[in-house]
Amino acid sequence: MHQMQAGPGMFLYAHDVPQAVAIRGKERLLTACGKNVTDSKHYCCKECQIADWKPHKGVCKSKYLKESYAPGWVVENRIPAFMAGPPLAMFGSLQYFWGNIPALDLLKVKDNEGEEAIMQRDVALLFAASGDLRNVIKTIIGLPESYAGNCTVVVNDLNTAIVARNAMLLLTALHFEPEVAAPIMLHLWYSAMLPQAILQALQDGILPYIHDVCNKIKDKPTDSMQAKTFEIGGSSVRLMLKKREWVGLATMFKVPEGLRAPEAQSIRRSVTMTRVDHIDRHIYKMSPGRRAGAIDFRQHGVLLPFGASRKDFAMPNP
């Protein structure tokens, strides 16, 4: 068997099959379960097909992939929980790691100043109570590629955990080459589990910056504000935190002692897989494929193409 990279016109399906491959075209492909349909999962050979049958069987026969899918309260002929409870009920932790609306481009250069007019102008942006970085990133990449001005962005938030993750993401973008930084940022941002290689890259590449600051401010008052500017390749990130927040940031590069993958997933699923009536209401109008993908992400919390191997994602995201 030969390994190939998936691309346009290719099919890839591999849970934990180490050598599962994708082949262009359909004439040599084997379907997973004899279903001769366009969106069926395909394999390069019988060996891969057999090796992947056990995980595929559960997916293929999933109720979420059926056009006839109905919410649990319909199947069981009962009143859904959200109809019987209070109009507003708090649930889960009070952490808001992701925003609940799509990213916004605050500048929309083409619709306002215009690309030519802004090309040499300096831009200063404030994202107060920013939450995650989606609006920051959407706005920055909206600038023309040949933009030659200085762009200064100030980002703050009251939530220390959000600020810490934003700092890790920005330092990752600053330190690593784009093709290395992109997958690290993606999974640090959205995946509940990480490969050891990503954790190691963060610990080797970014954590020394934080340790250096912590060593220099060790004698400062706990609640004193301390700032450090990191400069690489003409870009810079200035991070201003309280001393205790710098110390806390350093701990976020390592998995908490004693927390293993099964326990981390159990804690996560106690939130993501409960309140089934609310979940059913959310996914009911989705297409079968999107519905199955949404449930898969709720169960495993790894942002990968549906069916891609999660084998290397064995470390809890700190």
Put a short name on every predicted segment:
Residues 1-37, 42-144, 158-165, 173, ...:
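N-terminal charged/capping segments associated with class I S-adenosyl-L-methionine
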Residues 122, 144-318:
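Class I S-adenosyl-L-methionine-dependent methyltransferase module
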